[in-house]
């Protein structure tokens, strides 16, 4: 990425974009057709946009300003004082939340239904409250299958093969 657009990389891998409208709009604005094509996945989008378009965006002062504002907003969000930080007494440094699946965003298809969506919403709300929660789960290399019907009416499943390097994931050790 051009220097002035480098914050887009961090914005893309922090899943807050999935519930932060302004950040989603920023990515969509880069190339609306590509945004639709990659299923609203900012990591995939950054790999899809041609270098010429990135240079064009880097020369657009208004766009660069929106990138800088989104970066500053994320920095404040991550470091800012929120509900949890205002609690009195001893607080845990981290809270583990265990679920076999998390429905955070379609760009990270690691859920199949209600349990995953509930777990994802719990992580999002905890994040907004400043709770130091860590979602511990499983990585399904095939993700969630897509359903279709055959010509004779039978359900058919298509399992996508997920490349962890192309997902908004970071391996922690």
Give each language-model segment a name.
Residues 1-173:
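Catalytic cores of carbohydrate-active enzymes across secretory and cytosolic contexts
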């Amino acid at each position: 990425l051009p220097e002035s657009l480098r914050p887009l990389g961090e914005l893309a891998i922090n899943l807050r974009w999935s519930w932060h409208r302004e950040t989603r709009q920023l990515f969509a604005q880069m190339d609306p057709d590509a945004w639709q094509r990659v299923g609203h996945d900012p990591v995939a989008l950054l790999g899809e946009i041609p270098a010429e378009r990135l240079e064009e965006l880097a020369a657009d002062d208004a766009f660069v300003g929106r990138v800088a504002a989104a970066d500053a907003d994320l920095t404040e969000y991550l470091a800012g004082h929120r509900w949890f930080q205002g609690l009195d007494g001893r607080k845990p440094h981290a809270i583990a939340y265990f679920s076999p699946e998390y429905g955070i965003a379609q760009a990270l298809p690691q859920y199949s239904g209600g349990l995953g969506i509930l777990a994802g919403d719990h992580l999002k709300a905890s994040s907004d409250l400043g709770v130091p929660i860590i979602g511990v789960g499983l990585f399904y290399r095939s993700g969630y299958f897509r359903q279709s019907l055959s010509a004779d009416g039978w359900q058919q499943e298509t399992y996508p093969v997920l490349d962890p390097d192309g997902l908004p994931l970071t391996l922690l050790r």
